[in-house]
């Protein structure tokens, strides 16, 4: 019984960690594509609802574990250790909890970068904006924040203050994208070995050495766990706001 609970919590928290990254990727893309809507309806309540949605999906994905684990111990207990032994769940769970979110993250991240580059080009090519940005050319110009996109969609700001705000937002957005890019890269590097090996354990049962596969899974799963521990370090290392918050 304890094995079913242990594996359920393991799958739940790992899936929730992955789904949160996927939600962040989607949220950033929506903020860039539709800044007016996102800025108007972005609130603590909306953020809370997004978090609830992530946890609901995570619970839904992991719930089969206690359902079949409490009924049949052989599906969660093998050779004296707690081990998920249901091949169907391993395959389906790996795709739903990792490969599908990974695909969404990769696509939305590159679409976000593309949109930011496009908006930055439009911002710099605008004659009025170009004049205001000339004295701030030392700042990166490859991205644009959703906040400034929202303001540009409503009205044109004038004066050097607006220029500073625009370029500061561009710089902040670029830094944010870099941090997210690093987080996503570490996510892939640290979780991909486990899920690939997890699928191999099911597909090549006859030809693969079970002891080797089992040993690899034990190592790779801990590397995956470290992914969540590394994220706060990445945020604090590359973002002053997070450094101040954790100080």
From Swiss-Prot:
Coarsely, its chief localization is membrane
Q: How does it sit in the membrane?
A: Multi-pass membrane protein
Chain location of the short sequence motif NPxxY motif per the record: 231-235
Could you tell me the gene encoding this protein?
HTR2A
The entry's cellular-component GO terms read: axon; caveola; cytoplasmic vesicle; dendrite; presynapse
**What residues bind serotonin, as annotated?**
10, 198
* Pfam families, per the entry: 7tm_1 (PF00001)
Keyword Phosphoprotein listed? The answer is yes
- On the Cytoplasmic side, which residues? 27-46, 114-177, 238-247
Expression across tissues is:
Detected in adult intestine, especially in mucosal epithelium, longitudinal and circular layers of muscularis externa and myenteric plexuses. Highly expressed in Paneth cells, and detected at lower levels in enterocytes (at protein level).
Which residue stretches are annotated as topological domain Extracellular? 1, 71-87, 204-211
Q: How does it assemble?
A: Interacts (via C-terminus) with MPDZ and PATJ. May interact (via C-terminus) with MPP3, PRDX6, DLG4, DLG1, CASK, APBA1 and MAGI2. Interacts with GRM2 and DRD2; this may affect signaling.
Q: Which cysteines are joined by disulfide bonds?
A: 3-82, 204-208
Any one GO biological process: release of sequestered calcium ion into cytosol
- The entry's keywords: Behavior, Cell membrane, Cell projection, Cytoplasmic vesicle, Disulfide bond, G-protein coupled receptor, Membrane, Phosphoprotein, Receptor, Synapse, Transducer, Transmembrane, Transmembrane helix
Q: Which GO terms describe its molecular function?
A: G protein-coupled serotonin receptor activity; neurotransmitter receptor activity
What regulation of activity is recorded for this protein?
Answer: G-protein coupled receptor activity is regulated by lipids: oleamide increases HTR2A-mediated activity.
Q: By what name is this protein known?
A: 5-hydroxytryptamine receptor 2A
**Stated family:** Belongs to the G-protein coupled receptor 1 family.
SUPFAM superfamilies associated with the record: Family A G protein-coupled receptor-like (SSF81321)
The sequence motif named DRY motif is recorded at 27-29
**Residues the record lists as Phosphoserine modifications:** 135
Which residue ranges traverse the bilayer?
Answer: 2-26, 47-70, 88-113, 178-203, 212-237
Site annotation (Hydrophobic barrier that decreases the speed of ligand binding and dissociation) points to: 84
Q: What is known of its domains?
A: The PDZ domain-binding motif is involved in the interaction with PATJ, CASK, APBA1, DLG1 and DLG4.
